[in-house]
Amino acid sequence: MALSDADVQKQIKHMMAFIEQEANEKAEEIDAKAEEEFNIEKGRLVQTQRLKIMEYYEKKEKQIEQQKKIQMSNLMNQARLKVLRARDDLITDLLNEAKQRLSKVVKDTTRYQVLLDGLVLQGLYQLLEPRMIVRCRKQDFPLVKAAVQKAIPMYKIATKKDVDVQIDLEAYLPEDIAGGVEIYNGDRKIKVSNTLESRLDLIAQQMMPEVRGALFGANANRKFLD
């Protein structure tokens, strides 16, 4: 039985409605999927940027912390250097004061003579040369001459060697030093400095750990003494 025009139109409308509905559903599905992908991508981008921002500020924070440590280390080093300089200045002042007091030793002739006797004899023992020359301040000549005369027989007995010891009459030690002697071998190429200043410097160097300990206390970081 043939369909009437009305039936045909009705079926066409029904098919059109079905196609339209399916198209709408497909479009909605595409929109939903697109929105889902968009949200996923947006979330990924947001998370990526968030991580980048966090990483940036963490890096900045580490840089600032490192700069703080460096600045603190520099400040501590500067403070430590200031303390060391102040300590060295104090020790230098004490040594200078001690050198100034050496003049008092020289004024006591008896005491100074005993000191010269020891310095001359010690210098002879250090050189152990067959011929030696003793140099002194011009004003100390009589005392040094007496010291040399005492030292020669003591040296000969101790070393069992003959020796020729002369006092330098061509050159004297500067008058502005505290005193003491310098002793040379025969050709003046080897010298033993036994001036009062050189002896004080030697003693100060040998006793520096004790001096520092007495002034500033023991150094907890130091394992050995000089």
From Swiss-Prot:
Q: What is this protein called?
A: V-type proton ATPase subunit E 1
Predominant location:
membrane
User: Where are the N-acetylalanine residues found in this chain?
Assistant: 2
Q: Which domain of life is it from?
A: Eukaryota
Membrane topology recorded in Swiss-Prot or TrEMBL = Peripheral membrane protein
- Source organism of the structure: Rattus norvegicus (Rat)
Decide whether keyword Transport is in the record.
Answer: yes
Q: What Pfam families is this protein classified in? A: vATP-synt_E
| InterPro entries according to UniProt | ATPase_E_C (IPR038495), ATPase_V1_Esu (IPR002842)
Q: Name one GO cellular component term.
A: extrinsic component of synaptic vesicle membrane
What are the protein's UniProt keywords? Acetylation, Cell membrane, Cytoplasmic vesicle, Hydrogen ion transport, Ion transport, Membrane, Phosphoprotein, Synapse, Transport
* Manganese keyword on record: no
Q: Which gene encodes it?
A: Atp6v1e1
Similarity comment text for this entry: Belongs to the V-ATPase E subunit family.
In this UniProt entry, the residues modified to Phosphotyrosine are 56
- Subcellular location(s) per record: Apical cell membrane; Cytoplasmic vesicle, Secretory vesicle, Synaptic vesicle membrane; Cytoplasmic vesicle, Clathrin-coated vesicle membrane
Gene Ontology molecular-function annotations? ATPase binding; proton-transporting ATPase activity, rotational mechanism
Quote the function comment for this protein.
Subunit of the V1 complex of vacuolar(H+)-ATPase (V-ATPase), a multisubunit enzyme composed of a peripheral complex (V1) that hydrolyzes ATP and a membrane integral complex (V0) that translocates protons. V-ATPase is responsible for acidifying and maintaining the pH of intracellular compartments and in some cell types, is targeted to the plasma membrane, where it is responsible for acidifying the extracellular environment.
Instruction: Give the range the annotation lists for the signal sequence.
Output: none
Subunit structure of this chain's protein: V-ATPase is a heteromultimeric enzyme made up of two complexes: the ATP-hydrolytic V1 complex and the proton translocation V0 complex. The V1 complex consists of three catalytic AB heterodimers that form a heterohexamer, three peripheral stalks each consisting of EG heterodimers, one central rotor including subunits D and F, and the regulatory subunits C and H. The proton translocation complex V0 consists of the proton transport subunit a, a ring of proteolipid subunits c9c'', rotary subunit d, subunits e and f, and the accessory subunits ATP6AP1/Ac45 and ATP6AP2/PRR.
